[in-house]
UniProtKB/Swiss-Prot annotation:
Alphabetic keyword roster: Ribonucleoprotein, Ribosomal protein
UniProt GO MF annotations: structural constituent of ribosome
Ribonucleoprotein keyword on record: yes
Domain of life: Bacteria
Name of the protein this chain belongs to: Large ribosomal subunit protein bL36A
Signal peptide region: none
SUPFAM superfamilies: Ribosomal protein L36 (SSF57840)
A Pfam family recorded for this sequence: Ribosomal_L36
Family assignment from sequence similarity: Belongs to the bacterial ribosomal protein bL36 family.
HAMAP family listed in its UniProt record: Ribosomal_bL36
Length: 37
């Protein structure tokens, strides 16, 4: 899980999702998981 100021999709499987006001990137590649912090 990466924590970043700006989350971006890294590949075509990445999706930007808002959960409880937190912006996240979910992907089939676990290295692409991100969270805005």
């Amino acid at each position: 899980m990466r924590v970043r100021a700006s989350v971006k999709t890294l590949c075509r499987n990445c999706k930007v999702v808002r959960r409880r006001g937190v912006v996240r990137v979910i992907c089939t590649d676990p290295r692409h998981k991100q969270r805005q912090g």
